[in-house]
Amino acid sequence: MTNTVQIKINRKPEVLAMTGLKKSTFYTRIKEGLLPPPIQLGSERTVGWIEHEIQAVLAAMCAGMPLIQIKELVQDLINQRTKF
């Protein structure tokens, strides 16, 4: 049996609804390394976020993980993108 990762891409309105953040706060958190950046879906302006990455960060926040560890988690998630 092979392990297959089911990847779901969410667009900005879905991710904003998942996080409960306003757009400006959302982009600030990406710049600060507290949320993963989007991936390109074709054209330069078409982007989306990998759902399991957002869910992992939200779970870490709910668990009370310190910000420095959340930044490390986000970096690990970004680094794992090359393994798909």
Regions found by a protein language model. Name each.
Residues 1-29, 56-63:
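Polyanion-binding surface elements
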Residues 39-46:
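Short Lys/Arg-enriched helix C-cap and helix-to-coil transition segments
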Residues 32-39:
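Short, solvent-exposed alpha-helical "recognition" segments
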Residues 53-84:
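A short, Lys/Arg-enriched interface patch at domain edges and termini
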